């Protein structure tokens, strides 16, 4: 999750979730669409604001091989977003440290994807991406099911590659 006061990523232990699941709520709290979620006197938003792909955390935790599921097709480049500019303007007074992450969110995302591509080229990662664009706020159940089916079929087609990558043999 993103600590709204610090404007930095904060990793929490999911095993210590309270009964109201505020930690889970924070992981979905997109600035401007949802209020910051208070946990132990601190306010949090979705972690993707500061760290869109948690590959560096996985490496810091000692992992050397990664299966990464991206939510955008291969050709996608995140552009500067007017909604992030508006969110930065509105949140500036209450959470001034959120301004920079919001205004540079597209750069963070594109850099993380580039790094994942490098890991894949070095044989340290397998990347899975949708074969066609999916709306990030999709509500249509049929379209969501189609997206799920696409991912499942992609995994089945690449199962031999996945097993080899993980060192599993038949």
Give, region by region, the residue ranges found by the protein language model.
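Patatin-like phospholipase
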Residues: 1-170
């Amino acid at each position: 999750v993103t600590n709204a006061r610090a404007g930095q990523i904060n990793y929490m232990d999911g095993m210590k979730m309270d009964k109201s699941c505020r930690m889970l709520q924070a992981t979905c709290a997109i600035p401007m669409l949802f209020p910051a979620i208070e946990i132990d006197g601190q306010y949090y938003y979705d972690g993707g604001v500061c760290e869109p792909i948690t590959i560096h955390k996985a490496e810091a935790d000692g992992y050397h091989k990664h299966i990464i599921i991206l939510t955008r097709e291969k050709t996608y480049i995140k552009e500067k977003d007017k909604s992030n500019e508006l969110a930065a303007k509105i949140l500036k007074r209450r959470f001034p440290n959120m301004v920079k992450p919001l205004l540079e969110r597209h750069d963070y995302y594109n850099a993380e994807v580039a790094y994942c591509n490098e890991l894949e080229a070095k044989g340290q990662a397998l990347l899975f991406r949708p074969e066609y664009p999916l709306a990030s706020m999709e509500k249509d159940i049929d379209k969501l099911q189609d997206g799920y089916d696409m991912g499942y079929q992609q995994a089945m087609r690449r199962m031999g590659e996945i097993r080899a990558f993980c060192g599993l043999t038949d």
